[in-house]
Amino acid sequence: MRPSLAELSVDDLASVLAQWGYKRSHAGRVLREYYARCGELTEAGRPWPAGLLERLRIEFAPGGTALAARQVAADGTTKLLLRLADGRTVEAVLMPDYRADRAAGCLSSQVGCAMGCDFCATAQSGFERNLTAGEMVEQFLALRREAASAGRKLQTVVFMGMGEPLLNLDAVLTAVRRIADNTYGGLGWRQVTVSTVGLVPGIDALTAADLGINLAVSLHAPDDATRAALLPAGRRFAIADILAAVDRFQASRGRPVIIQYCLLKGVNDSAAHARMLAAVIGSRRMHVNLLHYNPTGLSLRGVRYEPSGDEAAAQFLAELRARGVVTHLRRSRGPDIDAACGQLRAKRGELSVQS
């Protein structure tokens, strides 16, 4: 099987080119073109050295990831089912921005997920394997290509799809570098967000990497007991320890950290829960995203969760804002095609090809 250019660094490719008798300096141009043209190499632009493109096309696959299916929601959100070289599948999502020429992308970091969050569809599929950096890059390129076909620019990406990014941190960081750095994808560091359920060692490792990216933490409860029932990771790391790790990240980064909070009817959505959350956050510079729960059927524990009503969600929002917490109530993107938060499962039988 031919390797993918998405798996290579500039130094990796430079060594290959040198073995072929080409200048090492061509490697940077090859990869810049590859990323700018969404995973393709063409004759456009200034001439290439004789035979180089032909040799690259022979030795390297455009990518090991293929589009298996595509589905478009009523709100314009597009979900891609991508088949990996080993036959496994993952999902990536493109979300149109309110600006007509922009879009955001959601990337997966693993096939399945081992975190077992009780209200998440991905958890019900279990964990199969980590994605390579190149497989994550190929998701990015697929979404960039999808955005371009719709006349949009892929402006930001979030690692919030299938999997826990901090359990695949080395590959995720490599993918982030390839996506953000001008040598490769050129998206920009501040345009990348990595999400976690709150794995303290992983947050500290992300801090040590010092990449200038954004951090989002899926909290989903203001107290340890409620959180432990919803997220098994809550039994390993107390909220106080998670926020201490977030403080260390923020001290080196200087930008607000995002707190993700999925509102579940009768579970974590009362005014008292909101006041507890505000107290936990205190004076920290955080932005809370309140998420509408997207039903996934019975949970791992056999619970049928329901989304909070509009009145409860509005009251929760008001309680936080009244206490000085920057808060937004996010609308679901693509729930009608199971593309919204917590709905990704990568089942081919549930996704049909649409044009």
Curated annotation (Swiss-Prot):
GO MF terms held by the record: 4 iron, 4 sulfur cluster binding; metal ion binding; rRNA (adenine(2503)-C2-)-methyltransferase activity; rRNA binding; tRNA (adenine(37)-C2)-methyltransferase activity; tRNA binding
Transmembrane segments: none
Keywords: 4Fe-4S, Cytoplasm, Disulfide bond, Iron, Iron-sulfur, Metal-binding, Methyltransferase, rRNA processing, S-adenosyl-L-methionine, Transferase, tRNA processing
Cofactor binding note from Swiss-Prot or TrEMBL: Binds 1 [4Fe-4S] cluster. The cluster is coordinated with 3 cysteines and an exchangeable S-adenosyl-L-methionine.
Major localisation: cytoplasm
Residues annotated as catalytic: E91 (proton acceptor), C341 (s-methylcysteine intermediate)
This enzyme's EC code(s): 2.1.1.192
One Gene Ontology biological process: tRNA methylation
Function: Specifically methylates position 2 of adenine 2503 in 23S rRNA and position 2 of adenine 37 in tRNAs.
Cited NCBIfam families: rRNA_mod_RlmN (TIGR00048)
Protein name per Swiss-Prot or TrEMBL: Probable dual-specificity RNA methyltransferase RlmN 1
Organism (species): Opitutus terrae (strain DSM 11246 / JCM 15787 / PB90-1)
